[in-house]
Amino acid sequence: MPIATPYEDLLRRVLETGTAKSDRTGTGTRSLFGQQIRYDLGCGFPLLTTKKVHFKSVVYELLWFLRGDSNVGWLQQHGVTIWDEWASETGDLGPIYGVQWRSWPTPSGEHIDQISAALELLRTDPDSRRIIVSAWNVGQIPQMALPPCHAFFQFYVADGRLSCQLYQRSADLFLGVPFNIASYALLTHMMAAQAGLSVGEFIWTGGDCHIYDNHVEQVTEQLRREPRPYPKLSLSQRDSIFDYTYEDVVVQDYDPHPAIKAPVAV
């Protein structure tokens, strides 16, 4: 069976047919709008093999989100620096992803734990069409170091299988999206385990899907490479989704091509 390469197919499509656009960082991009890719999580874990993805950073970032944290201190303690460019001198990032996931503020002064609420619906009302978690809190965007790129996601259960669809408003295809795919695939595995479900699909939907002009050489190199089989994910059982540790998450048989470095557009 041929190896599915939806991410690489999108990368090639944007590289070849994308529209030249300016952007906030002043770097310049080529871009397509409204793209979608799908992975069957039962056929392997979608950690890219056409270049090595730093999975340690993926796992720790997701655990950091699930902690409801928004200070880079905890990440730095574990050797992860992917958020440092946007942090204040004290390490703060404002009310970004983790804060919104775990402690969305209400007008009455209360807070909503969206992850716990989503899990409760998966267990008690899996056919609900309201199993959604949003990081896009319009009223708090000015306080965020960076407005959410991956803005909200929805869970869907069919035949005992849990699928997740993410909407990403702004998609740095070369650097950011490989992390996002792996992160939300991992979150889907965790949520499925906690709800007593198998995994279904991870569907990634992108708004502004772009390749930065200073990433074109790296993208071209990546697209020359032959894809390899996806690894398998091994996840320890925990009583709560908030109890997972880095050691609970293991990818097996991951044999990627070497990493490709590229500058981050800040």
From Swiss-Prot:
Catalytic activity, as annotated: dUMP + (6R)-5,10-methylene-5,6,7,8-tetrahydrofolate = 7,8-dihydrofolate + dTMP
Localization (cell): Cytoplasm
Pfam families listed in its UniProt record: Thymidylat_synt (PF00303)
Database matches in PROSITE patterns: THYMIDYLATE_SYNTHASE (PS00091)
Residue positions of the active site: C149 (nucleophile)
EC number: 2.1.1.45
Pathway assigned in UniProt: Pyrimidine metabolism; dTTP biosynthesis
Sites where the protein binds (6R)-5,10-methylene-5,6,7,8-tetrahydrofolate: H54, D172, A265
Binding-site residues for dUMP, renumbered to this chain: R24, R129, R130, R169, S170, A171, D172, N180, H210, I211, Y212
One GO cellular component term noted in the UniProt record for this chain: cytosol
Key words, A-Z: Cytoplasm, Methyltransferase, Nucleotide biosynthesis, Transferase
Xref: SUPFAM superfamilies: Thymidylate synthase/dCMP hydroxymethylase
Molecular function terms from GO: thymidylate synthase activity
HAMAP family reported for this sequence: Thymidy_synth_bact
Protein family: Belongs to the thymidylate synthase family. Bacterial-type ThyA subfamily.
Complex formation: Homodimer.
NCBIfam families: PRK01827.1-3, PRK01827.1-5, thym_sym
Entry function: Catalyzes the reductive methylation of 2'-deoxyuridine-5'-monophosphate (dUMP) to 2'-deoxythymidine-5'-monophosphate (dTMP) while utilizing 5,10-methylenetetrahydrofolate (mTHF) as the methyl donor and reductant in the reaction, yielding dihydrofolate (DHF) as a by-product. This enzymatic reaction provides an intracellular de novo source of dTMP, an essential precursor for DNA biosynthesis.
Identification of the protein by name: Thymidylate synthase
UniProt organism field: Mycobacterium ulcerans (strain Agy99)
The organism's taxonomic lineage, starting at the top: Bacteria, Bacillati, Actinomycetota, Actinomycetes, Mycobacteriales
